[in-house]
Amino acid sequence: MSRAALLSLTLTDFRSYERATLRPDGASVYLFGANGAGKTNLLEAISLLSPGKGLRGSSLIEVGRRLPGEATGRAWAVAAETEAPQTDFGQDEPVRLGTGVELAGAARRIVRIDGETVPPGRLADHVRPIWLTPAQDRLFLEAASERRRFFDRLVFAGEPAHAGHANAYDKAQRERMRLLTDAAESGQPADAVWLTALEARLGAAGALMANARARTLMALQAEIDSRGDRPFPRARLALTGEWEKLALVGVEIAEIEARLAAALAAARPRDGAAGRALTGPHRGDLAIHHVDKDRPAAECSTGEQKALILNLVLAQAARLSRAKDAPNPILLLDEVAAHLDLKRRAALADEITALGLQAFLTGTDQSLFDHLKGRALGVRVSELGLTALEDV
């Protein structure tokens, strides 16, 4: 296993930072300071060292620093050095990662590893951030799409190929629906050969998506069940989508692929009239049940819901930390400690230490991280910049 840990992080014209450098040297970090000081901006920068839009889901234009009167965000960059993989011949020099845009308003970001421009997916070979933010506080009250997005990020952390399958599925889905809606509006039949080809692509990508979700869910459930000694609520997980259910009961990928393609072909008139596809892995949902209280998570208190989600993220981190062929995750926990009681804050600190992972945590009050003192780097975030404490 390659231990994923940041040795340094440098932001240039990113959000509120003109330029800032943090040097954790592989240690966990707790960031504290007033609301609006820029703590979450640092976590967002780390989250962009992975494919996708990061923990805020922002566009590239939004993250560039913008001064009053400027119409668009500036060109920005995030650079980091990470620990190199340990091999039989020792450890190499640190790996240099970088991402950003070279022109203000650019719609595509550049990714470089050791100075070489590479596809964003290559970042997953070196760091795999997993995050939990206040935006997930309403996870059980939001639409199913938000829970799918949350769960798919957990899947991706363990199986980076999942993102490619999801992108291929979404692209084919858009093409198919454009054909069907155009046909419905014009009254002319859609190109059947083209539709069949698209549905074959949807079947292939959708079957892989459903299988990866099912595989991740079973592994996560086993991990959660083994964590009964932690002071976090136990969860029972379920995937409600029909295609994920097939994967969960052991139906082969080829069979799911064939069934999904056939179901889509049969649903052409219905989907064209509805203006959306009514079957497929894009319709599934994640259900979480509080075991000890025997009730759905949506019916639990806000505090218990947050603890359930945190335990789910920690279970995924623990599972991935034992992987033999991939870097372990970097945990990004935004304003999580503030919602935990003293016992759970202590347990969270112990868990991070025991797993040997690098974690970045934020909070307004330094006292929230008393249990991490001596085990993590404390950094005060203010309008003056980043100030590392000396009590590590």
From Swiss-Prot:
PROSITE patterns: RECF_1, RECF_2. This is DNA replication and repair protein RecF. One of its GO terms (molecular function) is ATP binding. It comes from Caulobacter sp. (strain K31). GO terms for biological process: DNA replication; DNA synthesis involved in DNA repair; double-strand break repair; SOS response. InterPro entries: AAA+_ATPase (IPR003593), DNA-binding_RecF (IPR001238), DNA-binding_RecF_CS (IPR018078), P-loop_NTPase (IPR027417), RecF/RecN/SMC_N (IPR003395), RecF_2 (IPR042174). Belongs to the RecF family. ATP binds at residues 33-40. SMART domains: AAA. Keywords: ATP-binding, Cytoplasm, DNA damage, DNA repair, DNA replication, DNA-binding, Nucleotide-binding, SOS response. NCBIfam families: recf. It is found in: Cytoplasm.
